[in-house]
């Protein structure tokens, strides 16, 4: 298996990415969250010139954040800085959309978007809608070497639900999943293979990546130790953020756990968090407070909700032997790469996870 990192994107992400490269990681994936993080292409550009081997991926690009030629140009420009090391991940948007008060981007529109971007990267001239008008667009002089469309840029799609998995197969793209639970990861991997076959594609030709959010516990360490809470508390609260808006946008947890609390033992926490959420103002833009620090830090008023049970249930945390066993089962389920989040300020996670991975 390959192993990668993903990270909320600071402008100087290259420092974390270089550390991951030196530790033997294969990939680094950058979040496209425009009101929380630095610009994804700025950060990836710096990482491209500061690293030598590690592959750099958009994790993931949200179509509504930039028009087709801008996205294609960004990827082709990165490809000029790091030829053959750029990966193009796309998705309907979670954090980047929720944090501006929007639900997921339409799957049908994402299909057209990905087709157009990849068409431009092949040197073709797709027709797209710009300001309601159909226009043919393409790179006018790629032969100058200002960008690089000679080296292929593999495409992957974040597909947590059945419609996006069908789209992934239709476009013959690699697949990005999230490790919500072992049952979810195994079941969705089987479905992804079925979708590839239904689309006339060979599942073995496509890579399956799984983003896993967890901490490496020391022997005897509590799930709510200060160290663990710093590393994965922001992951646990992400699920609380998600549940508060599930009625409007659906839930990350919906496919395998329904909306609301994913475990009966957490119902009280979810109820109390809703009371906190409903206290946020302005009432028509509670998302402005709800998503502050999303996947980066726990806000002061959220701290009391980050319990050992919440972390144990909602994150992929465990001791090194436990995590190695889980990773082996992910490999058996068909995954080619495990990607772990490095929480800002907790870059030591790179070294902790590297020690887990080197024995797998």
Across the structure, where does each feature detected by a protein language model lie?
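Acidic-and-aromatic substrate-binding clefts and catalytic sites of carbohydrate-active enzymes
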Residues: 7-12, 32-39, 63-69, 182-186, ...
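N-terminal beta1-alpha1-beta2 module of alpha/beta enzyme domains
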Residues: 1-58, 153, 343
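Glycine-rich anion/phosphate-binding loops
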Residues: 64-77, 104
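Conserved, mostly hydrophobic/aromatic
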Residues: 24, 47, 78, 117, ...
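Hydrophobic faces of well-ordered beta-strands that scaffold small-molecule active sites
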Residues: 3-7, 28-30, 56-59, 86-90, ...
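Active-site mouth loops of central-metabolism enzymes
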Residues: 1-11, 61-69, 149-160, 214-218, ...
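Short, acidic/polar
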Residues: 9-20, 74, 159-167, 319-329
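An alpha-helical appendage that flanks or caps ligand/catalytic pockets
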Residues: 103-144, 190-332
């Amino acid at each position: 298996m390959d192993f990668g990192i993903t990270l909320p994107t600071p402008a100087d992400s290259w420092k974390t990415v270089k550390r991951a490269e030196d530790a033997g990681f294969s990939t680094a994936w950058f979040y496209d969250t425009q009101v929380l993080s630095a610009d994804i292409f700025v950060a990836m550009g710096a990482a491209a010139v500061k690293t030598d081997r590690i592959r750099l991926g958009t994790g993931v690009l949200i179509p509504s954040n930039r028009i087709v030629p801008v996205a294609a140009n960004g990827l082709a420009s990165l490809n000029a800085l790091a030829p053959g090391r750029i990966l193009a991940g796309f998705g309907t948007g979670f954090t980047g959309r929720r944090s501006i008060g929007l639900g997921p981007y339409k799957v049908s529109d994402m299909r057209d978007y990905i087709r157009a971007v990849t068409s431009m990267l092949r040197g073709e001239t797709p027709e797209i809608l710009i300001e309601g008008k159909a226009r043919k667009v393409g790179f006018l002089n790629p032969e100058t070497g200002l960008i690089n469309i000679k080296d292929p840029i593999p495409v992957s799609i974040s597909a947590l639900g059945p419609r996006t998995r069908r789209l992934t197969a239709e476009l013959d793209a690699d697949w990005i999943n999230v490790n919500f639970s072992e049952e979810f990861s195994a079941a969705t991997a089987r479905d992804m293979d079925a979708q590839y076959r239904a689309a006339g594609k060979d599942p073995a030709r496509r890579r399956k990546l799984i983003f896993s959010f967890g901490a490496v516990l020391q022997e005897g360490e509590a799930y709510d130790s200060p160290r663990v809470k710093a590393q994965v508390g922001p992951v646990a609260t992400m699920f609380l953020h998600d549940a508060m808006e599930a009625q409007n946008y659906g839930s990350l947890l919906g496919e395998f756990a329904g909306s609301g609390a994913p475990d009966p033992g957490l119902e009280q926490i979810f109820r109390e968090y809703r009371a906190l959420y409903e206290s946020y103002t302005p009432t028509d833009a509670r998302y402005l407070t709800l998503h502050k620090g999303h996947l980066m830090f726990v806000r002061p008023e959220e701290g009391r909700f980050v319990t050992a049970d919440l972390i144990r249930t909602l994150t992929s945390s465990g001791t090194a032997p436990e995590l190695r066993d889980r990773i082996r089962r992910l490999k058996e389920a068909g995954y080619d790469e495990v990607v772990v989040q490095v929480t800002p300020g907790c870059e030591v996670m790179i070294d902790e996870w590297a020690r887990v991975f080197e024995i797998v």
